[in-house]
Amino acid sequence: MADPRRPARVTRYKPPTTESNPALEDPTPDYMNLLGMVFSMCGLMLKLKWCAWIAVYCSFISFANSRSSEDTKQMMSSFMLSISAVVMSYLQNPQPMSPPW
């Protein structure tokens, strides 16, 4: 039995680019980055420990869902802001976090 494949018709796979179709880009890292910054500011200004911890969580999600080709400066600044919110909230009040309800 002969090989039915035609070598002249074989084409190499090229993944679709996000420049041609912006709907393929996932907005989750950007949203989590923004949420992380908002929660870390609330944690710093209002001294809410649970806001600071949610900011750290959002920063981790943003980092985990980001692409390697993206600029990491904004992500790292958001992460450092959330860590500083946790540190500052525990430096001002070292007691364990009380439930928000």
Swiss-Prot record:
GO terms for molecular function: protein folding chaperone. Keywords: Chaperone, Endoplasmic reticulum, Membrane, Transmembrane, Transmembrane helix. The chain crosses the membrane at residues 28-46, 48-65, 70-90. It comes from the Eukaryota. Pfam families: ASTER (PF03669). Residues 1-27, 66-69 are cytoplasmic. Residues 1-26 are annotated as: Disordered. Induction: Up-regulated by FGF. It is found in: Endoplasmic reticulum membrane. This is PAT complex subunit Asterix. The gene is WDR83OS.
